[in-house]
Amino acid sequence: MDFLLGNPFSSPVGQRIERATDGSLRGEDWSLNMEICDIINETEEGPKDAFRAIKKRIVGNKNFHEVMLALTVLETCVKNCGHRFHILVASQDFVESVLVRTILPKNNPPAIVHDKVLTLIQSWADAFRSSPDLTGVVAVYEDLRRKGLEFPMTDLDMLSPIHTPRRSVYSSNSQSGQNSPAVNSPQQMESILHPVTLPSGRDTSSNVPITPTQEQIKKLRSELEVVNGNVKVMSEMLTELVPSQAETSDLELLQELNRTCRAMQQRVLELIPRVQHEQLTEELLLINDNLNNVFLRHERFERVRTGQPVKAPSEAENNLIDLRPSTPPAVRQPEVTNNLSSQLAGMTLGSRSVSAGLHSLDTSGKLEEEFDMFAVTRGSSLAEQRREVKYEDPQATKGLAGALDARQQNTGAEESSASSDGAQLTNWMMRQGMVPVPQANFMEDIEKWLSTDVGESEDGKGVTSEEFDKFLEERAKVADRLPTLSSSSAGTPVSPAAASRHQKQAKEDDAMFAL
């Protein structure tokens, strides 16, 4: 078939591949390799011509230096060319008949060529695993693993992404934008999110423990840093993005990050039980925890974005004590008052002692109103008050005697109806100054004086203010006419009857002036 198509090196790209893989070269010609990639991307027949030329240079060639240069050109083209070239080199036929055939024991290839071929197969299998039309290399890779073939550890220093941005031609009007990279382009996204192949040493399906060397530990830790970087980027995106306002490009990048991190977690889980290194095992476990946490956050993000219903609380949550205030079905809103009795009445304590205390507070409120009336009368003159008030008026309950008498009756009613709890509450309120303290002896003296004063009056009518003023003037005149006691008569003893009358008269005068 190749004979019918002619010489593979006769095409423009074939000629350059022939020069780039010449055995006389001491090393790779990278400028020529990149020129080959440009021709493949820009021409219609470039991928097929390059594929035929590379295949011709590798198959049956005993000059392994040329084979090594051809493998380098092949790797460069896969990393820098598009899907048209990937379909050709990722096919199962090319991988088995060209690459695997080259490293067969009968060909006796050097170790560097053997490792180079296995590295290419492994990296392509990891990169093309999610592409349905590029799974030929994946099938070959899995078959080689089942046969027990050991793949080399990945060298991160030499690792570069499979997919790189295509060559773009900028117009003269867009030269200013040439310096700023397009971070949201699909090619760069694929380049950033290419899953890094963690070292496996042996077939990961077996349980053979791995004791890594110092070089392997260094490479593994550098790869774990890449995993941590992806986890950090995904976590920051979940923090910044709003589920209902996220753009399509951001959601695509987030989904790609999620797939990449899940692929990395599978490799981490394979290494955890096999690595015989305590510190590395701790680092792997920590990375696995971070991956699980970011996956949970992503699931919650998707649940909110898609509007899925939130899970109902479990029965265990319903069994918890509800400390919120319970509201009855029909509650009458109390009126807002500043009265202390109204505030205490709103507290449903259900105790007779509290009822007795509220009754006493209501009584004290009435007394406050009565004393407020006395405060209002202080604005008028004393003569006007005496002309308007009769001291013996039975209806004059605004006086001090009536108020004190009402207070005594209320206090007596409280003491007779209150229980032992009510007495304790009343005593406490008295000590706090909330309820006036009853003065029984003082009340008895006032009542005794009032009854005596009423008995001595000849008529049932009270004394007016004018009569009281006249009485005071007469008393003053009598006092002026009294003789002055001499020093000789000062020591004369006074009879007991006169002393009793004088004392009684003094008490009456004091009581009158007190009113």
From Swiss-Prot:
Residues 505-515 have a biased composition (Basic and acidic residues). GO terms for cellular component: cytoplasm; cytosol; early endosome; early endosome membrane; endosome; endosome membrane; Golgi apparatus; membrane. It comes from the Eukaryota. Residues 397-488 are annotated as: Interaction with MYO6. Residues 169-185 have a biased composition (Polar residues). Its main location: cytoplasm. Residues 215-303 form the GAT domain. One of its GO terms (molecular function) is polyubiquitin modification-dependent protein binding. Residues 20-152 form the VHS domain. InterPro entries: ENTH_VHS, GAT_dom, GAT_sf, TOM1, VHS_dom. It is a peripheral membrane protein. Keywords: Cytoplasm, Endosome, Membrane, Protein transport, Transport, Ubl conjugation. A motif (KRKK) lies at residues 48-56. GO terms for biological process: autophagosome-lysosome fusion; endosomal transport; positive regulation of autophagosome maturation; protein transport; regulation of endosome organization; signal transduction; substrate localization to autophagosome. Induction: Expression is cooperatively activated by MYB and CEBPG. The keyword Protein biosynthesis does not apply. Residues 166-185, 307-333, 480-515 are annotated as: Disordered. Monoubiquitinated. The GAT domain and the VHS domain are required for the interaction with polyubiquitinated proteins. Adapter protein that plays a role in the intracellular membrane trafficking of ubiquitinated proteins, thereby participating in autophagy, ubiquitination-dependent signaling and receptor recycling pathways. Acts as a MYO6/Myosin VI adapter protein that targets MYO6 to endocytic structures. Together with MYO6, required for autophagosomal delivery of endocytic cargo, the maturation of autophagosomes and their fusion with lysosomes. MYO6 links TOM1 with autophagy receptors, such as TAX1BP1; CALCOCO2/NDP52 and OPTN. Binds to polyubiquitinated proteins via its GAT domain. Belongs to the TOM1 family. Found in a complex with TOLLIP; interacts (via GAT domain) with TOLLIP (via N-terminus); the interactions leads to TOM1-recruitment to endosomes and inhibition of TOLLIP binding to PtdIns(3)P. Interacts (via GAT domain and the C-terminal part of the VHS domain) with UBC/ubiquitin. Interacts (via clathrin box and C-terminus) with clathrin heavy chain. Interacts with MYO6. This is Target of Myb1 membrane trafficking protein. It comes from Gallus gallus.
